[in-house]
A protein has these predicted regions:
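Conserved SAM/SAH cofactor-binding pocket of Class I
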Residues: 147-200
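Non-catalytic substrate-recognition/targeting regions of SAM-dependent transferases
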Residues: 48-64, 70-137, 144
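N-terminal accessory targeting/assembly segments
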Residues: 41-45
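Acidic, Ala/Val/Gly-enriched low-complexity intrinsically disordered segments
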Residues: 2, 8, 37-38
Length: 200
């Protein structure tokens, strides 16, 4: 029976200073008679200076996005630990999930839009529906990985980025030297990606 290889990018929420975290798990075969070890490699998005998960509790996470603190729901936060970090009381934005689905933002001295930097890339952030800000910071682990692959390819590289959202991967691939085609079904997201490209 073959081993399972899973590549999972995650943020520093669980592991603060690790580059790779190896987790061994037991894999039970379809006959439930043979147990095998499965190796999961998690790459940590540890290159951020302007983003961090500060704390998690009661189904929510407290994050720093540049100079601003946001509280957003996270279904993976299943523990009920005390909220001792003062950021919980000094947040700039809080996304409240509705029991009917969706939710809405509540703002406290938060600009309509601001910039966030990752290495030499610049992103324009603005909170919008479904708790989003226009960026998935944990994906920086992938940006670094394929950026290295592109730079070391020794040949011209073309990248087709589908469902490209606001262009984080597009900008990272282009910065590494690739020729990138950015595609997304949402005209608004494509426009936002163009703003990010202009800022970078």
């Amino acid at each position: 029976m073959a081993f399972l290889w899973i590549h999972v990018p995650i943020s520093r929420i669980w592991y603060s200073n690790l580059r790779k975290c190896y987790i061994k798990m037991l894999y039970i075969s379809y006959k439930f008679t043979i147990m095998k070890e499965v190796l999961i490699i998690m790459w940590i998005a540890d290159g951020w200076k302007e983003y961090e998960v500060i704390d998690t509790s009661k189904g929510e996470k407290l994050e720093r996005w540049g100079d601003y603190l946001l509280v957003r729901p996270d279904p993976q936060v299943i523990w009920d630990t005390p909220r001792k970090n003062r950021g919980w009381k000094h947040m700039n934005g809080h996304y409240h999930r509705s029991s009917r689905g969706g939710g809405e933002w509540e703002f406290f001295d938060l600009p309509h839009q601001w910039e966030l930097h990752y290495k030499d890339l610049t992103f324009n952030l603005k909170p919008f529906s479904f708790k989003h800000t226009g960026l998935f910071p944990e994906q920086a682990a992938n940006w670094d990985w394929f950026g290295d692959k592109i730079r070391n390819a020794g040949r011209p590289v073309k990248v087709l980025n589908l469902f490209a959202y606001t262009g984080g991967a597009t900008l990272a691939a282009a910065r590494a030297g690739a020729s990138v085609t950015h595609a997304d079904a949402s005209k608004g997201m494509v426009g936002w990606a163009k703003e990010n490209a202009a800022s970078s």
